[in-house]
């Protein structure tokens, strides 16, 4: 089965049924790609913390019923570990920070899922993003001053500050530059903009080095991720959010994503708890009703003051009408 089916493509698939492992390879004139998938059975030594709620501590029940309940509510943790790599040449016209490269796509994930048994495939609901290793290699001689900036962002996030997963700045004067980003979060396979979750932005500063149409560098990236049936299936190693290989320390540096400062605001407890709210996931309809809130907010006090002023004006208008009518 071809990973990226195209014309004039040489592809290879090898499978080790004993080890529950599959390797997909594809190569053509545009580049090379390879994918590795390993089932959870081969990685039982990886420790996982599960979210559990023991029925026996909630309900008082006979032993026989307790055993039946355990069987009824047991859930198998389905995990498929994947490593995907791809290589492509970049036109200097496209290396100016104006375009993005999606490092993981819905199409790729669907191809991974298509190799699973139907009963397992239908349970898969999450993708966990573990690590992204990026290698840039120049397509010109060594010794040319060619600064480059790279950022990996979650482009679903609207804030340009909060969308940053990691950034690196280096130079291709020595021919190559490499770094690793660790996103370490999971997302639903049903999220609308899945292809924008891992977006690579690159800015090649020496824009006059070549003309449009010339390939200035090669980007090779490797993404390690896991497909699971639960958001609670995966634990991540305690790595930094971004790392620069030791050999590149002198010619580059990295910038980690910022962790917010949480403000302990004890005054703001306003939350809408009105009745007749829409069901989560259902199509919303406009409703007119009373808004009941926990806590006092500035907006609610302002509304009360406005109502008082309106009431006063109505009383004044009423008195004026009485005077005009001679009452």
From Swiss-Prot:
It is found in: Host cell junction, Host plasmodesma. GO terms for biological process: transport of virus in host, cell to cell. GO terms for cellular component: host cell plasmodesma. Residues 297-327 form a coiled coil. The keyword 4Fe-4S does not apply. It holds the Pfam family MP. Keywords: Coiled coil, Host cell junction, Host-virus interaction, Transport, Viral movement protein. Transports viral genome to neighboring plant cells directly through plasmosdesmata, without any budding. The movement protein allows efficient cell to cell propagation, by bypassing the host cell wall barrier. Acts by forming tubules structures that increase the size exclusion limit (SEL) of plasmodesmata, thereby allowing viral ribonucleocapsids to spread directly to neighboring cells. Belongs to the caulimoviridae movement protein family. PANTHER family: CELL-TO-CELL MOVEMENT PROTEIN. Homotrimer, through the coiled-coil domain. Interacts with VAP. May interact (via N-terminus) with host prenylated Rab acceptor protein 1D (PRA1D). This is Movement protein. It comes from Cauliflower mosaic virus (strain BBC) (CaMV). The lineage of its organism: Viruses, Riboviria, Pararnavirae, Artverviricota, Revtraviricetes.
